[in-house]
């Protein structure tokens, strides 16, 4: 599957997971209409586990909110998380991390504590960081598969207690 008016880019941090680039990195190649590409965007996100859109015309948090809304994905309120989140645009765009700049950012497991976590999570960088600024992402189901393979007894014990 290919996304119209985009080109595939590469990053040194990318990994191959089950034969696919993670995350898939796309740059613009002509005019881009996310609403017209909705099915392709969501399909590529499912196939690759994540898409990094690099260089597209999304200059403000409001433009980012519009981009997300054009994909017609159910909005899930941020409930029960330990991190501080400040609303930026309505109930769709929030700060992701309000830790001091020197603190490392752990992997995001957004709303892992709820029975039905969101199928899609979107991140937006409003201002480039002077240094650092990375947001690490991981495919939780791949981590679980590797952990299950390496430590099956531990996984069985945890699952027996009803912990997910």
Please provide the spans of the model-predicted regions.
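Non-heme Fe(II) oxygenase catalytic core, chiefly the N-lobe of the double-stranded beta-helix
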Residues: 1-164
């Amino acid at each position: 599957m290919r996304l119209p008016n985009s080109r595939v880019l590469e990053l040194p941090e990318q990994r191959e997971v089950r034969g696919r680039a993670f995350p898939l990195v796309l740059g613009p190649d002509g005019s881009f209409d996310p609403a017209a590409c909705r099915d392709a965007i969501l399909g590529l996100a499912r196939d690759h586990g994540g898409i990094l859109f690099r260089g597209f015309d999304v200059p403000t948090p409001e433009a980012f909110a519009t981009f997300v809304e054009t994909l017609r994905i159910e909005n899930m309120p941020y409930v029960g998380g330990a991190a501080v989140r400040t609303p930026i645009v309505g109930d769709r765009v929030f700060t992701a991390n309000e830790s001091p700049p020197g603190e490392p950012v752990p992997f995001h497991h957004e709303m892992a504590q709820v029975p039905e976590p969101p199928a899609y999570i979107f991140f937006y960088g409003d201002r480039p960081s002077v240094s650092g600024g990375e947001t690490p992402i991981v495919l939780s189901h791949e981590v679980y598969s590797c952990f299950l393979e390496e430590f099956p007894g531990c996984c069985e014990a945890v699952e027996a207690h009803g912990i997910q």
